């Protein structure tokens, strides 16, 4: 573009130079016809040519036309050069764009398969864990059975002592024994017995009553042994539990040996066991308004030392 403009300017300058060279010729010629009048006809033709040649004099208007030199507006048109600059920032965009994948590989955490591979190691251990679970379940069942037995033993030792004394009271009254509790103490024992029976689940009440009957038989055996040793107890054995009823614990300490002595009841004691059991089944449910399953009338297996 610059070269083209330069050539155009040179062409304009050349034309103007030519016009300038031709201009003085007609200026000298009109002076000649003024001095040489006979030659006026010849210059007429020349003058006819001059107007044709002088006509470019008004086209000196191109002199303002070279004013297009300020028409360097093409230079303004060259301003598109900033337009090509636009792609320069445009290519800059891909430069930050490739930077995006650099943070994008951060999500690429190949460490995740490592924890995923860990379950693969744990998966072959699953059959082992299943066997362990079965063993644990069996152990838990055994432990639960042992815990239930221990709970029943604790119930016998602590909670059902009032029920034992209530049945003993009824048994003593039935046989006219002198070992009878006072009325106030007996009412307190009844309340404690009912509270304990209400807390026992219905499925365990039958076994609890059998344990009460068993405790009564063992208590009677203890009294017989003490009588044989000629140790008069009179009402001492009843006075000690009276002081400990509010705490829920009786003075019947031999009950701690009941787990070992549960199988010590002999078959010849079956009539005595049935008698006390019937008395307990008649007294406790009616006194405490508690439901006792009908199968409770059957003696539990193994209580008499038989399998």
Swiss-Prot record:
Residues 56-71, 81-113 have a biased composition (Pro residues). Residues 29-55, 114-134, 242-260 have a biased composition (Low complexity). The keyword Signal applies. The keyword Transport does not apply. GO terms for molecular function: nutrient reservoir activity. Substrate of transglutaminase. Residues 76-108 are annotated as: Sufficient to initiate the primary inflammatory response to gluten in Celiac Sprue patients. Belongs to the gliadin/glutenin family. This is Alpha/beta-gliadin MM1. The lineage of its organism: Eukaryota, Viridiplantae, Streptophyta, Embryophyta, Tracheophyta.
């Amino acid at each position: 573009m610059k070269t083209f403009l330069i050539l155009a300017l040179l062409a304009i300058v050349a034309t103007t130079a030519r016009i300038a060279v031709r201009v003085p010729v007609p200026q000298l010629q009109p002076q000649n016809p003024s001095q040489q009048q006979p030659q006026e006809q010849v210059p007429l033709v020349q003058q006819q040519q001059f107007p044709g040649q002088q006509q470019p004099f008004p086209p000196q208007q191109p002199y303002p036309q070279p004013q297009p030199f300020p028409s360097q507006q093409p230079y303004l048109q060259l301003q598109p050069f900033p337009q090509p600059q636009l792609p320069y920032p445009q290519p800059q965009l891909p430069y930050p764009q490739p930077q995006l994948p650099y943070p994008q590989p951060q999500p690429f955490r190949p460490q995740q398969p490592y924890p995923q591979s860990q379950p693969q190691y744990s998966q072959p251990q699953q059959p082992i864990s299943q066997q362990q679970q079965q063993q644990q379940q069996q152990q838990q069942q055994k432990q639960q059975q042992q815990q239930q037995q221990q709970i029943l033993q604790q119930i016998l030792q602590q909670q059902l002592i009032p029920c034992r004394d209530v049945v003993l009271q009824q048994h003593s009254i039935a046989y006219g024994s002198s070992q009878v509790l006072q009325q106030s103490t007996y009412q307190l024992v009844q309340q404690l017995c009912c509270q304990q029976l209400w807390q026992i689940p219905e499925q365990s009440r039958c076994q609890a009553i059998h344990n009460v009957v068993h405790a009564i038989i063992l208590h009677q055996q203890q009294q017989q042994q003490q009588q044989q040793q000629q140790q008069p107890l009179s009402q001492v054995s009843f006075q000690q539990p009276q002081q400990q009823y509010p705490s829920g614990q009786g003075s019947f300490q031999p009950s701690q040996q009941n787990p070992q002595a549960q199988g010590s009841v002999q078959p010849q004691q079956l009539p005595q066991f049935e008698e006390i059991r019937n008395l307990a089944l008649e007294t406790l449910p009616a006194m405490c308004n508690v439901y006792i399953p009908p199968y409770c009338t059957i003696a539990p297996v193994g209580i008499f030392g038989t399998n």
